[in-house]
Each structure stands twice: as structure tokens, then as C-alpha cells.
Swiss-Prot record:
SUPFAM superfamilies referenced in this protein's UniProt entry, alphabetically: L21p-like
Subunit structure: Part of the 50S ribosomal subunit. Contacts protein L20.
Function description: This protein binds to 23S rRNA in the presence of protein L20.
Region (Disordered): 110-130
Protein known as: Large ribosomal subunit protein bL21
Pfam families: Ribosomal_L21p
Keyword RNA-binding assigned: yes
Record keywords: Ribonucleoprotein, Ribosomal protein, RNA-binding, rRNA-binding
One GO CC term, this protein: ribosome
GO biological process: translation
Naturally occurring in which organism (per UniProt): Cyanothece sp. (strain PCC 7425 / ATCC 29141)
Cystine crosslinks: none
Tree of life domain: Bacteria
Amino acid sequence: MTYAIVATAGKQFRVEPGRFYDVDRMNVEPEQTVSLDQVLLVHDGDTIAVGQPLVEGATVEATVMQHLRGRKVIVYKMRPKKKTRKKQGHRQELTRLMINAIHLNGSSAKTAAQPAADEAVAANEVDSEA
């Protein structure tokens, strides 16, 4: 299983190819590709590359799916014995990213879909030989 730990907007996320994640709002239009360069760790199934603090030459390629707003969080402030109450709501602006690939030193790390595709190609070659 291939995964990476990336830092974006002051938070760290464990990301895998083919999955989507909600991060703080990015100034990128939907359907555009972004490259996340702050990669802290890369695991490609066999080896683990740990950065000091970042992994050299590692990037994560993602596509912006959409911009959305998170669930409403209610903030309630009250001063006892003063009849002072303040109720406020907040919805965080988010961007949904689909992780396309994890690149390490210019080469794409294996994704979960690639081994299955390789096996399907090998099965087709065996069938065509028979």
C-alpha cells in the first residue's frame, strides 16, 4: 500500500492515491491539478523515505474536485448571573482534493490500482498465447 504524509495549510494528512481529502480552502479553480511539495514521509510498499524535515524530490499530485463548506460549529458564550448570552455559528471553507499520484525522485510510486492492472495485462497475454 502506497501512502505519503503531506503538510498543507498548517496540518498534516496521510494521503493515498485514488482517495479524496478535505483541506482548508485553496485558491485554485476546480478541475485543476496541484502539486503538494511538503512531503514528510513516503511509503511505497517496500521502502519508507522519512524526510529531515522534507523528503527530497517527493511530490504529491492532486486534482481539485470542488470547493465546499464544512459542518456548522456552534459557539455559545454565556456570562453567569448577567443575562448575557451570545450564540454564533461558523462553517469552515474547504477544498476537496483527489490524490492522483505520489512521485518520489521523479518516478511515480506504485499505486493500489497498478498491480491489478499489471495482473490483468499478464492474464490477457497468457490467454492470447493459448
